[in-house]
């Protein structure tokens, strides 16, 4: 596990909400701007560079205070990546601040689109509410919305492929149905000029939303509902989800990652002043995640049969 050291004036951070400081690893020493993202006892941080020899611009250090396993968000990002959805890269770091141990953090770097163009949205609803596409949108997104709102099914099925990577959008929805986490996200343009959706970390910590009344994310005044009203797209979505549930969202596929990360956490847990659990309790969290995957798999299979 990488050791990360932050040096800054806590009073400046408390007074202004941001503080200048130093970010130190075995590889580099960099001046940074630090922002505290919440008021938890073990706080989460956003770190920004103006210039970096290693090319970093922003990273997020998440304390994962609401997840005693420290693994669920990392597993979600990794799962998105495995099924082909560009996602943030996450790893573990052990953080010290001004020489004092703060403990294990999830170190997250957002996906950088190849085209360097992206459109952030102000929602964590993965179905993409159509209200997002308003007059304040970019010209491209506004044109996209006009197509969705006015085109008939046949025209939409034909022309939407000029604007949206439909398969990747469906995989984005499937990733959300499986992981059942809360994510902010951004629209990105790929090299062929088509939109895709990528989960992202922001300064605000995403709040988990529940869609148990709509577990397959097919309802509402949303982009997903509009596309899935077309039989060919609904069939494609069904096939993709069936394949993901069979091949990717499985104990066999995900347990090696969970085991590896669990061992990494256990090696540093005793030095984390905020981890109060015994080794047995930490081990139990690993078992809980595997049980959750199995239960979610069964739940989604039952709903998929009615799609």
Swiss-Prot record:
Entry keyword annotation includes Cytoplasm: no
Keywords for this protein: Sporulation
Subcellular location: Spore coat
A Pfam match: CotH
GO biological process, alphabetically ordered: sporulation resulting in formation of a cellular spore
Protein origin, superkingdom: Bacteria
Chain segments annotated as transmembrane: none
InterPro entries: Spore_coat_CotH_CotH2/3/7
Main localization category: other
PANTHER family: INNER SPORE COAT PROTEIN H (PTHR40050:SF1)
Primary role: Involved in the assembly of several proteins in the inner and outer layer of the spore coat.
Family statement drawn from the similarity comment of this UniProt entry: Belongs to the CotH family.
Record protein name field: Inner spore coat protein H-like protein
């Amino acid at each position: 596990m990488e050791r990360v050291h932050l040096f800054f004036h806590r009073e400046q951070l408390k007074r202004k909400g941001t503080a200048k400081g130093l970010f130190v690893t075995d590889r580099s020493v960099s001046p940074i701007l630090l922002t505290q993202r919440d008021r938890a006892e073990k706080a989460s941080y956003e770190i920004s560079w103006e210039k970096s020899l290693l090319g970093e611009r922003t990273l997020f250090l998440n304390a994962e205070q609401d997840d005693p396993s420290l693994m669920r968000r990392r597993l979600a990002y990794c799962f998105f990546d495995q099924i082909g959805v560009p996602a943030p890269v996450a790893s573990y770091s052990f953080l010290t601040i001004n020489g004092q141990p703060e403990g294990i953090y999830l170190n997250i770097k957002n996906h950088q689109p190849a085209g360097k163009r992206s459109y952030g949205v102000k929602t964590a609803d993965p179905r993409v509410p159509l209200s997002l596409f308003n007059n304040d949108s970019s010209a491209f997104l506004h044109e996209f919305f006009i197509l969705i709102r006015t085109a008939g099914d046949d025209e939409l099925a034909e022309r939407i492929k000029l604007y949206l990577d439909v398969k990747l959008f469906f995989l984005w929805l499937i990733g959300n149905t499986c992981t059942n986490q809360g994510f902010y996200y951004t629209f990105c343009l790929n090299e062929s000029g088509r939109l895709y959706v990528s989960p992202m970390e922001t300064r605000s910590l995403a709040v988990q939303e529940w869609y148990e009344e709509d577990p397959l994310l097919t309802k509402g005044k949303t982009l997903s509902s509009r596309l899935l009203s077309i039989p060919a797209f609904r069939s494609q979505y069904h096939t993709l989800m069936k394949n993901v549930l069979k091949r990717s969202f499985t104990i066999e596929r995900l347990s090696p990652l969970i085991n590896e990360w669990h061992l990494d956490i256990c090696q540093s847990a005793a030095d984390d002043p905020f981890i109060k659990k015994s080794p047995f309790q930490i081990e139990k969290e690993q078992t809980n995640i595997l049980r959750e995957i199995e239960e979610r798999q069964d739940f989604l299979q039952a709903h998929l049969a009615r799609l």
